[in-house]
From Swiss-Prot:
One Pfam family linked to the record: Med8
GO molecular function: RNA polymerase II cis-regulatory region sequence-specific DNA binding; transcription coregulator activity
Organism phylogeny: Eukaryota, Metazoa, Ecdysozoa, Arthropoda, Hexapoda
Keyword Cell wall biogenesis/degradation found: no
Gene designation per UniProt: MED8
Organism: Anopheles gambiae (African malaria mosquito)
Protein name: Mediator of RNA polymerase II transcription subunit 8
First-listed, main subcellular location of the protein, grouped into a coarse class: nucleus
Location in or out of the cell: Nucleus
Biased composition (Polar residues): 215-224, 235-249
Swiss-Prot/TrEMBL GO biological process terms: regulation of transcription by RNA polymerase II
Family (UniProt): Belongs to the Mediator complex subunit 8 family.
Coiled coil location: 1-26
Source taxon at top rank: Eukaryota
């Protein structure tokens, strides 16, 4: 009995070590994908993936060559169930399982599918087993016919594309380098542009701002007449002397 318990402890320790290595490798890979997604290269990603694959292979090898009593013959039973938060359990599971209650224990210790999923799987298996050979062969033939039709369409499209690519002389030119250079020279340097002869008809003469600002407002009017004098005001004013005594003083 002691020998079997010792072998079981050794097996569990080896499995836990391999699981910790696997968890660490997965965490490192996820961290790199989240932080180094712009600089990570394909060989580095393949190296991380190969490391995870090696840990999985080692874990499967340990489980396949079990030492002592096979794990599938053992039963895991909870020692204590409580609806309260267990800090020791939270620390032991690295924050994943805070409570080990009556409602959660079956889900954590379940080794078979959910009863509803198991019943649906059994119904599908029974339906597949009740299918006759003729019906199954007919369905397989229809499936192969659909696959062949899709394959023919893809193959024909591939052949048409290859023929079109082989017969195409090349990329058709849609621009002229000479015309582009002439346009750039005309816009940037004015090459090829001629100025009009004589002043344009109907255009006014522009006066520089300095001349406009320095000219007085009493300049000659556009009609050539002299500026108009001061117009007489129709309002009569009565200016009194300042030394006149106010009547209300």
């Amino acid at each position: 009995m002691q020998r079997e318990e010792k072998q079981l402890d050794m097996l569990l320790e080896a499995v836990l070590n391999r699981l910790n290595d696997l968890k660490h490798s997965i965490g490192v890979m996820i961290h790199r994908l989240e932080t180094e997604y712009e600089t990570i290269n394909w060989p580095t990603f393949l190296d991380n993936f190969a490391l995870i694959s090696s840990h999985l292979t080692g874990l499967m090898k340990i489980l396949s060559t079990e030492i002592g009593t096979p794990l599938r013959n053992l039963t895991v039973l909870p020692l204590m169930l409580t609806p309260e938060r267990d800090e020791a359990l939270l620390q032991l599971t690295e924050g994943r399982v805070p409570i080990f209650s009556h409602d959660l224990a079956p889900d954590y210790l379940r080794t078979k599918p959910d009863p509803g999923a198991e019943s649906r799987q059994a119904a599908h298996e029974a339906k597949a087993n009740n299918l006759t050979v003729e019906a199954s062969m007919k369905q397989v033939a229809q499936y192969n016919k659909v696959i062949s039709h899709v394959w023919d369409i893809i193959s024909k499209a591939k052949e048409d594309w290859e023929n079109e690519s082989s017969t195409r002389p090349g990329i058709q030119q849609t621009s002229s380098m000479a015309d582009t250079q002439a346009l750039v020279a005309a816009v940037g340097l004015g090459n090829g542009l001629t100025a009009p002869v004589g002043p344009p008809t109907g255009a006014g003469v522009m006066i520089p701002p300095a001349i406009r600002q320095g000219s007085p407002m009493s300049a000659v009017s556009p009609s050539g007449n002299a500026p108009m004098g001061k117009m007489p005001s129709g309002i009569k004013t009565n200016i009194k002397s300042a030394n006149q005594v106010h009547p209300y003083r």
